[in-house]
Amino acid sequence: METKIYLAYGSNMDLAQMKVRCPGARLLGAGRLDGWRLLFKGSRTGAYATIEREAGKHVPVLLWRVTAEDEKSLDRYEGFPDFYYKRQIQAVTVNAAGRDCGRTRGMAYVMHEKRRFCLPQGWYAALLERAYENFGFEKEILREALAYTAEHC
């Protein structure tokens, strides 16, 4: 069965959601995207996490091994190709202590850059905050993303 690595930085860091959305997916561990910034953009339906290139920044991610069927489910959920597009990105993998332990390439969904900055609803921000807590990610990255987005709304 063909699989690929998927890099999740938004609501797909929620284990319960991923279990339902992508039953064949397996969590491989945590990592980060160096040279990327987390922010929020959206449309009339709401605001969601996305990433953009920025030197000196990094975004924590979960690495999932997904099947072709899981990827189709993610495509529907992410609004691919109209809302998000797919991009291969190199991630630094980290161990439980947060130390670098390797590099791997994976697929991430990136929102089209033309989308407007917009703050997410409280439930969405809370979902990401819980994921950051669960995996020991720096909550300051999430706070900074919200502040950066607010400045650009």
Regions found by a protein language model. Name each.
Residues 1-153:
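Glycine-aromatic micro-motifs
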